[in-house]
Regions:
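Extended, amphipathic alpha-helical stalk segments that mediate dimerization
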Residues: 1-37, 45-118
């Protein structure tokens, strides 16, 4: 039972760290070019370390980029699917939470996405 609890804590920490990094990236966009360049390397380093540490603990963070075609077979929950007709072609507008998998590829936590029309 304690192992499951620790796994849940680690998964939640991964998700919140990923969210923090995405927010940091949005803040970087507001900086002038010189300042942005100065801090962008830190974000790259942070994301690399997050992925490395997740892998060491047996986890993988999976995300989809904005503009990727949406498929109902993706391991994600949609927050606005009810806004579209079933036959509409959709793409991911924003990834709100990443997918967390174990090293065997089993989904431990589904991601969350916001969709838009293609």
């Amino acid at each position: 039972m304690e192992t499951e609890c620790m796994q849940d804590v680690f998964i939640n920490t991964l998700i919140e760290s990923w969210r923090f990094a995405k927010t940091y990236a949005k803040i970087l966009e507001k900086l002038d070019l010189r300042e942005r360049h100065k801090y962008a390397g830190r974000l790259t380093w942070y994301m690399k370390k997050l992925s490395e540490n997740a892998a060491k603990a047996g986890f993988k963070i999976k995300e989809y980029e904005a503009g990727e075609p949406f498929d109902t077979g993706m391991a994600v929950t949609t927050v606005n699917m009810d806004e579209f007709a079933p036959e509409e072609a959709l793409v991911i507008e924003q990834m709100l939470e990443p997918i967390i998998m174990n090293r065997e590829g089993q989904i431990l936590q589904t991601g969350t996405v916001l969709l838009r029309r293609a």
